[in-house]
Amino acid sequence: YKLTDWLTLTYRMGMDRYNMTDRTVIAENGAVAPEFQKGRLSENDVTYEYLNSNLMLTASKRVNDFDLNLLLGQSVEDTKSTVNRRTGYKFIVSDFPSFDNINDGNKRLQSNRTQKRLMGVYGEFRASYKSLLYLTLTGRNDWTSTLPVDNRSYFYPSIGSSFVFSELFPENTIFSFGKVRASWACVGKDTDAYATTTSLFAPLEFLAGTGVGNSWERGNPYLKPEITESTELGLEMRFLKGRVGFDVT
């Protein structure tokens, strides 16, 4: 939505969702394991859903020889997955692969549900002067559900600039283009869902009762966001109307 001739408001929302079901049947005498010699049946139901929402305010303005652009935004990402598994072995009646054809003691049920949410605010400022000098500043702050409360907020900025020095030279057929650039950036990253907790889980769930066990993985309640820092310098030059050139980073 165009608020003014230089100010625009944009909202985007998208969803990615899929369902997957698979069924595996091992006929009698078709397995190596002795307990499966009278047949085995397994079914998996997987549901995945990813929701993304972005609200952006964009401003573009030209002031004398300067082109100025500002972007402010807010985003939300929500990821959910559900996996339901059930298995059974030792068919009562031969060649009839059905869970109704398996004793309760030989059935296994397992359910796993995962949810993760990430919310962020971000901004980008871009400025250029006479197609000669360019400057870009960015910053983003995220809040994640996968880290401890004290560490779930993290900020990461970046700065980049370039100088097109070929604009200072008169136009000629030999030297076509020359630019030097430099940038510094930080990128933040969270972790997987439930990585901070150690909990019991139900590896096998019988129809006649339930069972729980300790996980082989121990959670870390002191996890912090991962911050990656990078610095880049580069030189790009082209000659003979762009036919020959190089780009070094």
Question: What is each residue range found by the language model?
Answer:
Residues 1-26, 36-249:
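Extracellular/periplasmic, surface-exposed regions of secreted and cell-surface proteins
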Residues 29:
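Phosphate-binding loop and its immediate beta->loop->alpha context
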Residues 32-33:
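N-terminal, polar/charged subdomain of small-to-medium soluble alpha/beta proteins
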